[in-house]
Amino acid sequence: MQDVCNSQEILQDYAMELDRADVALLNAVQKNNRLTSEELADKVGLSPTACQRRLKRLRSLGVIEADVSIVSPKAVGRPVTMIVMVSLERERADIVDRFKSSIRNTREVMIGYYVTGDADFILIVTAKDMEEYEEFTRRFFYENHDIKGFKTMVVMDRVKATFAVPIEI
């Protein structure tokens, strides 16, 4: 995924070249990436071979970053979700890079954003219970001298969870 992040200029140029068939394919696979080539062909009006060729190109360009299943945290014993606002002690490139690396290497962090505003990072974290989250905060936040502070919001209800991006041409 690191390579995908480094190709933003290519993706921005490519976004201008998406045609209706690409958009239809992307919208279809964002909803269900288990559709067969024949089912995709019916939805977008192309042959199954053309659909596969286009999907391969979209993957190679990084437009499609991954083909994954979205797993319910609750179903696998991680029913507690937190949104955590993290502020760094100083905003220096080496500190930011070090914290980004720690986010990538920490299994409890599902999503991490480097942001502007009141915090430096927003994290989505899951835990099996609050005791496990407390242990995580001690290890991940309190033992890290680069962190000035953090604020936790506990999610009461997951109203919507999707990675589908609205696409228009």
From Swiss-Prot:
SMART domains: HTH_ASNC. Residues 18-79 form the HTH asnC-type domain. InterPro entries: ArsR-like_HTH, AsnC-type_HTH_dom, Dimeric_a/b-barrel, Tscrpt_reg_AsnC-like, Tscrpt_reg_AsnC/Lrp_C, Tscrpt_reg_HTH_AsnC-type_CS, WH-like_DNA-bd_sf, WH_DNA-bd_sf. Keywords: DNA-binding, Plasmid, Transcription, Transcription regulation. PROSITE patterns: HTH_ASNC_1, HTH_ASNC_2. GO terms for biological process: response to amino acid. Residues 37-56 bind DNA. The keyword Transcription applies. One of its GO terms (molecular function) is sequence-specific DNA binding. GO terms for cellular component: cytosol. It comes from the Bacteria. The keyword Transcription applies. This is Uncharacterized HTH-type transcriptional regulator y4tD. The lineage of its organism: Bacteria, Pseudomonadati, Pseudomonadota, Alphaproteobacteria, Hyphomicrobiales.
